[in-house]
């Protein structure tokens, strides 16, 4: 079991290793995403947050997942193209993963172990659940799919000013 956020590693959309130790000192928002979901328009607000704060040490990592209503059926290339064409996404989109179950990615196993959801439920309930990590690698908040990215603005500002 991973003991530190910075020990985590995943694959980027090209299948290359992405080590979380490069995120030290940054505020990070991690979101499981999907292209064919009612919450898909959240990409727009996520991109706005990223553009607003990326120069101040803020990063968003999007993790495509097809576990909820099969709403992310595309290949990694198709997902990237969709995000760029429809929402102008410039924040990193990682390789498609599972977030729940026996094949769940280690990133999500770690996040869920650090911050349970509503009523202590650890599993991810739907697309566009969000985890906010401070600049010391502590998972400080978990937000449901219903939480609009724009509503996280003050929280992100506060973490960036610490």
UniProtKB/Swiss-Prot annotation:
Q: Which GO terms describe its molecular function?
A: glutathione peroxidase activity; phospholipid-hydroperoxide glutathione peroxidase activity; thioredoxin-dependent peroxiredoxin activity
Q: Does the keyword field hold DNA repair? A: no
Taking the first listed entry, what is the main subcellular location of this protein, grouped into a coarse class?
A: cytoplasm
Q: Which reaction does it catalyse?
A: a hydroperoxide + [thioredoxin]-dithiol = an alcohol + [thioredoxin]-disulfide + H2O
Output the Gene Ontology cellular-component terms.
Answer: cytoplasm; mitochondrial inner membrane; mitochondrial outer membrane; nucleus
Biological process per Gene Ontology, one example term: cellular response to oxidative stress
Q: Which segment of the chain is annotated as a signal peptide?
A: none
Q: What class of enzyme is it?
A: oxidoreductase
Highest taxon of the lineage: Eukaryota
Do you know which SUPFAM superfamilies this protein is assigned to? Thioredoxin-like (SSF52833)
Q: Which UniProt keywords apply?
A: Antioxidant, Cytoplasm, Disulfide bond, Membrane, Mitochondrion, Mitochondrion inner membrane, Mitochondrion outer membrane, Nucleus, Oxidoreductase, Peroxidase, Redox-active center
Q: Active site annotated at which positions?
A: 37
Q: What induces it?
A: By oxidative stress, dependent on transcription factor YAP1. By oleic acid.
Sorted alphabetically, which CDD domains does this protein's record hold? Answer: GSH_Peroxidase
- Which cysteines pair up through disulfides? They are 37-83
**Enzyme Commission numbers on file:** 1.11.1.24
Would the keyword Oxidoreductase be found if you checked this record's keyword annotation? Answer: yes
Topology with respect to the bilayer: Peripheral membrane protein
Q: Which compartment or compartments is the protein found in?
A: Cytoplasm; Nucleus; Mitochondrion outer membrane; Mitochondrion inner membrane
Family annotation (PROSITE patterns) = GLUTATHIONE_PEROXID_1, GLUTATHIONE_PEROXID_2, GLUTATHIONE_PEROXID_3
* Family designation: Belongs to the glutathione peroxidase family.
User: Could you describe the subunit structure of this protein?
Assistant: Monomer.
**Reported function:** Glutathione peroxidase-like protein that protects cells from phospholipid hydroperoxides and nonphospholipid peroxides during oxidative stress. Plays an important role in the oxidative stress-induced response in the presence of Ca(2+). Has peroxidase activity using preferentially thioredoxin as a reducing power. The redox state of the mitochondrial GPX2 is regulated by TRX1 and TRX2 (cytoplasmic thioredoxin), and by TRX3 (mitochondrial matrix thioredoxin). Involved in sporulation.
Q: What more does the record tell us?
A: Present with 2010 molecules/cell in log phase SD medium.
Q: What is this protein called?
A: Glutathione peroxidase-like peroxiredoxin 2
> What organism does this protein naturally occur in?
Saccharomyces cerevisiae (strain ATCC 204508 / S288c) (Baker's yeast)
Q: Which gene encodes it?
A: GPX2
């Amino acid at each position: 079991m991973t003991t530190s956020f910075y020990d985590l590693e995943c694959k980027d959309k090209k299948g290359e290793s992405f080590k979380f130790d490069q995120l030290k000192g940054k505020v990070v928002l991690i979101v499981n995403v999907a292209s064919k979901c009612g919450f898909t328009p959240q990409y727009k607000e996520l991109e706005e947050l990223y553009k607003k704060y990326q120069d101040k040490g803020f990063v968003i990592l999007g993790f495509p997942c097809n576990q909820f209503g099969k709403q992310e059926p595309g290949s990694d290339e198709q997902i990237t193209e969709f995000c760029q064409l429809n929402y102008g996404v410039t924040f990193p989109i990682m390789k498609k993963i599972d977030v729940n179950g026996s094949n769940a990615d280690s990133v999500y196993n770690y996040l869920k172990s650090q911050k349970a959801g509503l009523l202590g439920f650890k599993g991810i309930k739907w697309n566009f659940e969000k985890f906010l990590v401070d600049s010391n690698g502590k998972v400080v908040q978990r937000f449901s799919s219903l939480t609009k990215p724009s509503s996280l603005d003050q929280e992100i500002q506060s973490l960036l000013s610490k």
